[in-house]
Curated annotation (Swiss-Prot):
Pfam families to which the protein is assigned, alphabetical: Herpes_UL92
Lineage: Viruses, Duplodnaviria, Heunggongvirae, Peploviricota, Herviviricetes
Organism: Ostreid herpesvirus 1 (isolate France)
Origin: domain of life: Viruses
Protein name: Uncharacterized protein ORF30
Length: 248
């Protein structure tokens, strides 16, 4: 049964009513997703505007044009799509790291939104003791294991790519990695432009290679030369970062 729509939002997506934010954009039909991690997809549609997917199962919530589903009344996120299409995945041919990411997504862990997950933790911890480290904060969370696991694999992969060059060049690459993560985190959580600029400048100075007195220097050097087997050695530089250093 086709739905009727009475309004259009700013991006041109049809919505049921003014209070309904369900995406009703015209969605593109796809046969693979996530850079080829998911393959052989059937009746799966993607909205690039809202970065959501739809699996048309003929339940009557879709808009059909020329026998093709063009808009969905029931959209899904990544983990749901992975669950729906899990049997279609060509998992065995994937690298170990990609298999891990798919398993995490199938369990509901949104790997590509790891920065958002950390941002939420920082927001929650913001009202607490600013002298508390992220490690102490995470230890109070029931899902600390999954969070640390994702951090471990993220850093292990990034560090695994740093295989050539001098110690100084490796150190510079790791600084850039830390800085990019910090800036993305801070940029996503700040709404006040002036405060954002001050905070980004503060973090950039903190992590700058020229700031040799920064506690990051010692931590990163240890991280580069350490055994990558143990997650705590990978995430410790980040876990040791005091929350007060992320706020003005």
């Amino acid at each position: 049964m086709k739905r009727s729509y009475d309004s259009i939002n700013e991006c041109g997506a049809y919505i049921n009513n003014a209070a309904d934010n369900i995406c009703q954009c015209k969605m593109n039909r796809i046969d693979s997703a996530f850079g080829g991690w998911l393959t052989n997809l059937t009746e799966v549609y993607y909205c690039p505007t809202h970065n959501i997917y739809h699996h048309c199962d003929g339940d009557g919530t879709c808009i059909i044009v020329n026998s093709v589903c063009t808009r969905s009344g029931t959209c899904m996120g990544i983990s749901t799509l992975v669950g729906v299409t899990h049997d279609l995945m060509d998992i065995d041919s994937l690298p170990a790291f990609d298999r891990f990411k798919l398993r995490m997504m199938n369990k509901g862990y949104f790997w590509i939104s790891m920065q958002d997950r950390l941002k939420e933790e920082l927001e929650e911890a913001k009202s607490g003791d600013e002298g508390m480290t992220m490690e102490t904060h995470f230890r109070n969370k029931p899902d600390v294991e999954s969070t640390l696991t994702r951090l471990y694999y993220y850093f292990k992969r990034e560090l695994g790519m740093i295989t050539r060059g001098t110690q100084e060049s490796k150190l510079e690459k790791v600084y850039i990695m830390f800085e990019e993560m910090a800036l993305r985190l801070l940029e996503s959580r700040m709404t006040n432009h002036d405060k954002k600029q001050k905070l980004l400048a503060k973090v950039s100075k903190l992590i700058s290679k020229q700031n040799t007195k920064s506690h990051f220097t010692t931590s990163v050097n240890k991280l580069i030369t350490s055994d990558l087997t143990y997650p705590e050695r990978i995430v410790k530089p980040l876990m040791d970062l005091k929350l007060s250093e992320l706020y003005i």
